């Protein structure tokens, strides 16, 4: 192994875990108290986190097991799909995941600028004013050049950013714990009381449905270490970092959701404007708490944005190394950063940023679509684990036995399907249209390969035809108004 190859494999467990935490915890956590209290009492909130934690554990464990038994698959999410189900499925998962994170990063730009409006009103209001577009565009290229300086250097900055992100979260937890009163927490625990100030929240099942729409998306980013597995010092670090990041984030989410119920009543929390953590601390400790949370929001979003800039450039780079994306994406600079992938990705982000200026409503729709587009990657990974567990090639030795892998894969598939269903049919059909846009790029990449027959085998053609027909069906349903956008 050359020194240049070694230099690219320099991410340890802490750096990878930092990537996971920073990828998962973004600006949304600062609105979590209000988001949860808007539809549920404390009892239903507890149940929703138990159910979500149970389901996401199997997704996290899927990545842990796969990184342990197949450490040779160093391109993570994309390669699991390709290895298990062929080049076209692998490409489609990689393409959809790439688009998802590109638009997700532009979402971070919008959130950052909107958060700045707290300090500089009204210049950045909504995140789509001209100053906001200029500011967001500048940050897109700042992060581009940070990552160009090297993945390791960017990861160190990300770890530092994650630490500074967690500090205001810890302060919020400490302060809400200090003001916590059990009597307040137990008041209308199941959300059934009816008063003028506090209407009934309905049955526990209806409350669960409302909170699950929040918690279902809370762990998007859990695959952060897997995507970067090709740059890990030790393949075992990938699984360790994924589990550590998952448990850490679950703990933070539970505390953030429940402690405010002991400081303020449910109807008070439900009516606090977002970011609601700022409103909670403004009530409990005064203006300085509100300022702290708004600063924390900006740091959190910037830290997550840096993480996803690293990850989103790694996706086409990894796919191109295996011949599925165009070869140009494999070019690295002297710092071993995927330079061409970074520039192309940042350029697409820049175009998307300009679109935000003209249509904020369309942008909100796009964010919902991209939330759905990440889920096929989870589904394919869990299905691949299930497939491996049944094969004769599954490792006979080792701590992870085939039955455990099979159970994890099955439950991971079930939970992934539930997430896709919960996302809504409308956004699923929109996502299919975006996935179909990748077909010409797949065909172009396949034609240039010596093993072109593999790219255009019968099942690959069937897959392309199936996705294409679904996309055409979606376009028909949207154009005729049978499904309203």
Curated annotation (Swiss-Prot):
Biological processes per GO annotation: amino acid transport
PROSITE patterns: ABC_TRANSPORTER_1
Topology in membrane: Multi-pass membrane protein
Matches recorded under InterPro entries: AA/rel_permease1, Amino_acid_antiprt, APC_superfamily
Main localization category: membrane
Highest taxon listed in the record's lineage: Bacteria
Keyword Ubl conjugation: no
GO molecular function terms attached to this record: antiporter activity
Cell location: Cell inner membrane
GO cellular component: plasma membrane
Function: Catalyzes the exchange of L-arginine for agmatine. The arginine uptake by the bacterium in the macrophage may be a virulence factor against the host innate immune response.
PANTHER family given in the database record: AMINO ACID TRANSPORTER-RELATED (PTHR42770), ARGININE_ORNITHINE ANTIPORTER-RELATED (PTHR42770:SF4)
Name assigned to this protein: Arginine/agmatine antiporter
Species the sequence originates in: Chlamydia pneumoniae (Chlamydophila pneumoniae)
The gene coding this protein: aaxC
